[in-house]
């Protein structure tokens, strides 16, 4: 009752607006499948199960999902043009948008510690990161993978200038690599499908490395929409938290990968991406010390690399009240283990979601 009362008080504290006719959610990937969906985030589960549509059934508000081949930068353009209300987006593009004046709020994490890989054609002589010097390498610039790639290069004594970098989206990079149009590519789980077909080799993986090399993603809302429709924002967050709970349960591991496979990325690829990693650690919605520290590090790195022209703050960009209300309402306070800025578990935050496999 207390949680419901606080949610009601939250809604009452802001000016009343008519319910929106539509809630538009932009997803920073082209996705795949029919209907189009995506994987690697609890949001994909909510999409596949139609939990958001269910939450707004009978309210007069419909839900629209929009997928962007141009990933994070294209989502920023849609936010700027008020074509979407919520965005599932990676850390770098969301902060580039903020630095460029987009008024958004970060509501929750939704797919963290996403791995980065370097792949080469199966017959390539490239064996290590250092071998990329002077080679044609695909990097999807402006995405969260871009900054992670720069950090991996730096850890191996290279800069982006040491490569013949080519800016290609995910699909174009795959076509270029298998036709030897590029010598190597940075990317994510989408490469496992080609690896399993014997077309490419993985020469580097962030798995088991410093989690600072991984990529984070979250759910944002346009500030204007959040201020006008706090009740609807709460409903959306409730659904994403419900999806995070389901996606964090090890009993659902096989079903989760089957759900994500609807996007066209096979189950085997998800098994490889999540190998030796707990679901709860990857699918927690918490904006904990680790997630906040990574977003702050992204600001510093992006500024140094001149990917943004001015620094931006992170602490006041986060709007935690909806997540906190959801955790109370759904009885999930203490469900996920929090991690510190280095990605280590915070003592005393053992949780039911961290059960070992």
Predicted regions and their residues:
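Secondary-structure end/capping motifs
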Residues: 33, 228-312
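A ligand-binding cleft/hinge motif common to bilobed small-molecule-binding domains
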Residues: 88-100, 150-151, 155, 182-202, ...
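Beta->alpha turn/N-cap motifs
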Residues: 27-29, 69-72, 82-95, 143-144, ...
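Extracytoplasmic "Venus flytrap"
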Residues: 22-48, 142
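Conserved C-terminal helix/tail region of periplasmic/extracytoplasmic solute-binding proteins
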Residues: 300-357
């Amino acid at each position: 009752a207390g949680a419901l009362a606080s949610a009601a008080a939250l809604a009452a504290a802001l000016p009343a607006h008519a319910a929106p006719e539509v809630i538009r959610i932009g997803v920073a990937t082209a996705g795949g499948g029919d209907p189009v969906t995506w994987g690697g985030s609890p949001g994909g589960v909510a999409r596949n199960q139609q939990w958001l549509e269910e939450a707004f059934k009978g309210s007069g508000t419909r839900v629209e999902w929009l997928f962007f081949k141009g990933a994070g930068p294209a989502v920023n353009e849609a936010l700027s043009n008020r074509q979407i209300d919520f965005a599932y987006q990676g850390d770098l593009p969301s902060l580039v948008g903020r630095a460029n004046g987009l008024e958004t709020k970060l509501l929750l994490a939704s797919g963290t510690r996403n791995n980065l890989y370097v792949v080469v054609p199966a017959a390539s002589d490239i064996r290590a990161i250092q071998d990329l010097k002077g080679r044609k390498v695909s990097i999807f610039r402006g995405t969260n993978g871009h900054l992670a790639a720069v950090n991996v290069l730096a850890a191996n004594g290279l800069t982006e200038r040491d490569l013949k970098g080519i800016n290609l989206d995910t699909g174009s990079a795959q076509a270029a690599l298998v036709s030897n149009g590029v010598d190597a590519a940075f990317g994510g789980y989408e490469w496992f499908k080609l690896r399993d077909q014997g077309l490419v080799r993985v020469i580097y993986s962030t798995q088991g490395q410093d989690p600072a090399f991984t990529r984070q993603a979250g759910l944002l809302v346009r500030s204007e929409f959040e201020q006008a429709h706090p009740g609807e924002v709460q409903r959306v967050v409730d659904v994403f938290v419900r999806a995070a709970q389901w996606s964090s349960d090890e009993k659902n591991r096989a079903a989760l990968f089957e759900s994500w496979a609807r996007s066209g990325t096979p189950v085997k690829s998800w098994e490889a991406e999540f190998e030796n990693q707990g679901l709860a650690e990857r699918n927690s919605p918490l904006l904990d010390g680790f997630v906040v520290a990574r977003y702050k590090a992204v600001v510093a790195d992006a500024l140094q690399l001149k990917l943004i022209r001015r620094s931006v703050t992170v602490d006041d960009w986060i709007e935690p009240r909806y997540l906190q209300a959801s955790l109370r309402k759904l009885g999930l306070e203490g469900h996920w283990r929090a991690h510190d800025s280095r990605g280590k578990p915070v003592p005393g935050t053992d949780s039911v979601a961290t059960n070992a496999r």
